[in-house]
Amino acid sequence: TPEYGQRNPYLQEVRFSVELNLNLPAYAPLQQVGNPVLITTTGVGTQGVYVINTGFDQFRAFEAACPNHAPNTCSLLKLSGQNVVCGCEGYTYTLFTGQMLERPNDGKRYYDLLSYQAELFANTLRVYQP
């Protein structure tokens, strides 16, 4: 796994900031623990951002592109419960921590999901990359 703070070489640094009103129907699932939502607003992340409520008013936000190769037509992660799966190699990641599940033991370096900042203010969730 990469050292803390080291960014992924396959995914570019995309600066963005988006505010999600949790009262709106599109984001209401985020009011419940364990319900992920995909944000596909243009300019938010490389291929979008998955956001999940992890409990106790804490949220996690992750890039929707697979972190283990350059973005392409199959690299958009597909939602599977509280996990996401790469359409290219089938790599699976948990949205609670961003960690890759069943990491191959072949000596190659594998990356966990690229994380973004998420802060809750009243009923508005700000997701951003400074």
Features from the language model and the residues they span:
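Short cysteine clusters
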Residues: 66, 86-88
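Short Gly/Pro-enriched turn/cap motifs at secondary-structure boundaries
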Residues: 106-109
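N-terminal pre-ligand scaffold of iron-sulfur
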Residues: 2-81, 94-95, 99, 112-130
